[in-house]
Amino acid sequence: YTPADEAEWDRFVMHESGNGTFLQTRNFLNYHPAGRFTDASLMVYNEHGGLGAVVPAALRMDGATRIFRSHPGSTFGGPVLRSTYNSAAKSIGILQAVEDYIATRYDAADFRPTPDLFNGVENVALQYAFTYLGYTQQTELSTWVPVAGRTPETLLASFRQNKKQDVK
């Protein structure tokens, strides 16, 4: 990635990816002061020259260990894949290409993929690819309540009495 790629990156994340959010756009990531992070973001192109994935990332040093990690300027990152790349083969291919690149320049990798709640399309293929390639995964509990068609009263009624005060 270079700053000249910002418009292509942001268009891809917001309009062509299945698991991208505004948190992975350059517009958001560039909010942080220049020099705060050593950007290591990648753009992965397919065999036809089309953009298949972006990986917002930065270099983190732990002593002498060079770690390629999800961009610290965002809550989560990980590979952001084209919305049509929802097969295990495509996900493994993208992640393997990223891993091959990382192996030549870094000692370790640390990804924080987009939680399922925020994915525009189901992304179990990417989760499978991480497991298939031997990554360990940290799981965080996230809870959501569908609110479509519900009034504030019926929504509050669905919470236990002792939790209602935390919601108001």
Predicted regions and their residues:
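Acyltransferase donor/substrate-recognition loop-hinge adjacent to the catalytic core
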Residues: 1-6, 124-168
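Short amphipathic alpha-helix that is part of the acyltransferase structural core
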Residues: 1-27, 165-168
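Conserved donor-binding loop and adjoining core beta-sheet/short helix segment
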Residues: 11-14, 27-100
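Generic beta-strand structural signal
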Residues: 77, 107-109, 139-143
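Short, charge-rich binding segments
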Residues: 99-104, 133-136
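Conserved GNAT acetyl-CoA-binding A-motif
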Residues: 104-115
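Acidic-and-aromatic substrate-binding clefts and catalytic sites of carbohydrate-active enzymes
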Residues: 117-121
